[in-house]
Amino acid sequence: MAQRVQLTATVSENQLGQRLDQALAEMFPDYSRSRIKEWILDQRVLVNGKVCDKPKEKVLGGEQVAINAEIEEEARFEPQDIPLDIVYEDEDIIIINKPRDLVVHPGAGNPDGTVLNALLHYYPPIADVPRAGIVHRLDKDTTGLMVVAKTVPAQTRLVESLQRREITREYEAVAIGHMTAGGTVDEPISRHPTKRTHMAVHPMGKPAVTHYRIMEHFRVHTRLRLRLETGRTHQIRVHMAHITHPLVGDPVYGGRPRPPKGASEAFISTLRKFDRQALHATMLRLYHPISGIEMEWHAPIPQDMVELIEVMRADFEEHKDEVDWL
């Protein structure tokens, strides 16, 4: 059942020169800018009695604005008592350190048991924020830092910051193969043409940029630090596979685990049982959506990646004399 929304207000003189969608988002902070933009495009907004369907239209101040729209009720998700590792929290945002095996948002095959369900239980008022305040996602088996908005204004500003590339997200990963130097992958990404749950580099895809640098070399693997400029689905995993260095353990874009010649049983066992992509969101930096203060958080790599790196490091030290690239 749809909820009717009827709003009226006068544009402030202080908003002179702002885009219409920006001005309305400030005037009606209970509604996200993306929702207001949809209403404008759907011709649900009157400015001085006339329909305005251009979100980029500049306001002069003093205009009379009326909105007559409907909101379809979002699917009701159940609060669930799922533990959350809270790294930081204030009245506007929550920073969580997501574990493996936890989906961020309910969807096909995962109707519940997600970060969203956990947030609804942890902080019930977040039900009034679209998508329970979730601003960006991590894959089910990618671990690490995420920001969640506790209010609509905080979410609106975080989404805008993400679009302006003002939020910095850095990851640690272990890739297959010996990489000689860092670099940048600037390749567009879209849905795979035949495998609809997969993503792929495609010339008609959306722009995607990943920067990477080498942290540590092993015999036939490389530990990396990566930074996202964009945030496409599976971006790091797709980009690294594209340059023939897929992530260790990646069940979709990786290959079979191939331990180096002469590897110990501990190495082989650890590699074979590592059943997720070796990827962790280790650093998050952003400007606080309300105060504007720059803030930064770090999350150490989880134990499974620690063990993986330790056996690779021990193997490298044992066979250093056999490595031909030193």
Swiss-Prot record:
Enzyme class of the recorded protein, top EC level: isomerase
Pfam family, one: PseudoU_synth_2
Reaction(s) this enzyme catalyzes, per UniProt: uridine(1911/1915/1917) in 23S rRNA = pseudouridine(1911/1915/1917) in 23S rRNA
Disruption phenotype: Severe growth inhibition, makes only very small colonies. No longer synthesizes pseudouridine at positions 199, 1915 and 1917 in 23S rRNA. In this strain a miniTn10(cam) insertion has occurred; the first 196 residues are present followed by 12 extra residues before a premature stop codon.
GO molecular function annotation: 23S rRNA pseudouridine(1911/1915/1917) synthase activity; pseudouridine synthase activity; rRNA binding; rRNA pseudouridine synthase activity
UniProt keyword Cell division present: no
EC identifiers of the protein: 5.4.99.23
Protein location: Cytoplasm
Name of the protein described by the UniProt record: Ribosomal large subunit pseudouridine synthase D
Cross-referenced InterPro entries: PsdUridine_synth_cat_dom_sf, PsdUridine_synth_RluA-like_CS, PsdUridine_synth_RluC/D, PsdUridine_synth_RsuA/RluA, RluA_PseudoU_synthase, S4_RNA-bd, S4_RNA-bd_sf
Keywords: Cytoplasm, Isomerase, Ribosome biogenesis, RNA-binding, rRNA processing, rRNA-binding
Function summary: Responsible for synthesis of pseudouridine from uracil at positions 1911, 1915 and 1917 in 23S ribosomal RNA. Other positions are not modified. Uridine isomerization occurs as a late step during the assembly of the large ribosomal subunit. Member of a network of 50S ribosomal subunit biogenesis factors (ObgE, RluD, RsfS and DarP(YjgA)) which assembles along the 30S-50S interface, allowing 23S rRNA modification and preventing incorrect 23S rRNA structures from forming.
NCBIfam families in alphabetical order: PRK11180.1, rluA_subfam
Lineage start: Bacteria, Pseudomonadati, Pseudomonadota, Gammaproteobacteria, Enterobacterales
GO biological process: enzyme-directed rRNA pseudouridine synthesis; ribosomal large subunit assembly
Family (UniProt): Belongs to the pseudouridine synthase RluA family.
Active-site residues per Swiss-Prot or TrEMBL entry: D139
Chain ranges of the S4 RNA-binding domain: 18-91
Subunit and interaction comment: In late stage pre-50S ribosomal subunit interacts with ObgE and DarP(YjgA).
Annotated GO CC locations: cytosol
